[in-house]
Amino acid sequence: MLVVKIAVPYAEALLELANANSSLKETTNDINIVSQFLANSSDLKKFLGNPLITRDAKKGVLKDVLGEQIGEKTLTFLMLLVDRGRIAYLDGIAYKFLELSYKEESIEIAKVTSSVQLSAQQQKTIAEKLKKITGAKQIKLALKVDPQLIGGFTIEIGSKLIDTSIRGQLKQISTLLGAV
């Protein structure tokens, strides 16, 4: 709940800035890159969330890791988050920004968590199936790998959850056996 309260104003401010500068597409691409980095690097997330690490160190790492891949305005926004002590909420801010940005373009976001990295073909197939199910013009996948799923994947889109994971099936069996 706290993450949402913090994430929404920053995401809305970044969206407003991107619209004012006619750079929504570039900013969305930048935030997508940031989001992928965070999804693939738990170490980076921990580093940014660690209150014992100085702001200058966090800024330096962000510049080194993302500086060449994202635009100057987005990097400045990240530095602002560091200065305000909100960089630990970057994942939530990025997700909320992408959600708002895509909503403006009639694009749905689906959080896909799988036990292994999905191939490009698997991603395409999932996106096509979700388009048919939701009726959305376009689907963007927010990918995450969680080996604890054992096998399969989960999809969160809107308020719906599709769980085809082995862990989910084991929970269902456990619940059924517990009810007997």
From Swiss-Prot:
| Main location as per UniProt | plastid
Q: Where is the signal peptide?
A: none
Q: What is its subcellular localisation?
A: Plastid, Chloroplast thylakoid membrane
A GO cellular component entry from the record: chloroplast thylakoid membrane
Q: Name the Gene3D superfamilies for this protein.
A: N-terminal domain of the delta subunit of the F1F0-ATP synthase
Annotated GO molecular function terms are: proton-transporting ATP synthase activity, rotational mechanism
Q: Which Pfam families match?
A: OSCP
Residue intervals passing through the bilayer: none
Q: What is the membrane topology listed in the Swiss-Prot or TrEMBL record? A: Peripheral membrane protein
Q: Which UniProt keywords are present, listed alphabetically? A: ATP synthesis, CF(1), Chloroplast, Hydrogen ion transport, Ion transport, Membrane, Plastid, Thylakoid, Transport
Question: Quaternary structure per UniProt?
Answer: F-type ATPases have 2 components, F(1) - the catalytic core - and F(0) - the membrane proton channel. F(1) has five subunits: alpha(3), beta(3), gamma(1), delta(1), epsilon(1). CF(0) has four main subunits: a(1), b(1), b'(1) and c(10-14). The alpha and beta chains form an alternating ring which encloses part of the gamma chain. F(1) is attached to F(0) by a central stalk formed by the gamma and epsilon chains, while a peripheral stalk is formed by the delta, b and b' chains.
Can you tell me which family this protein belongs to? Belongs to the ATPase delta chain family.
Q: Tell me which HAMAP family the record gives.
A: ATP_synth_delta_bact (MF_01416)
As for what it does, the entry says:
F(1)F(0) ATP synthase produces ATP from ADP in the presence of a proton or sodium gradient. F-type ATPases consist of two structural domains, F(1) containing the extramembraneous catalytic core and F(0) containing the membrane proton channel, linked together by a central stalk and a peripheral stalk. During catalysis, ATP synthesis in the catalytic domain of F(1) is coupled via a rotary mechanism of the central stalk subunits to proton translocation.
Report what the protein is called: ATP synthase subunit delta, chloroplastic
Q: Which organism is it from?
A: Emiliania huxleyi (Coccolithophore)
User: Upper taxonomic classification of the species?
Assistant: Eukaryota, Haptista, Haptophyta, Prymnesiophyceae, Isochrysidales
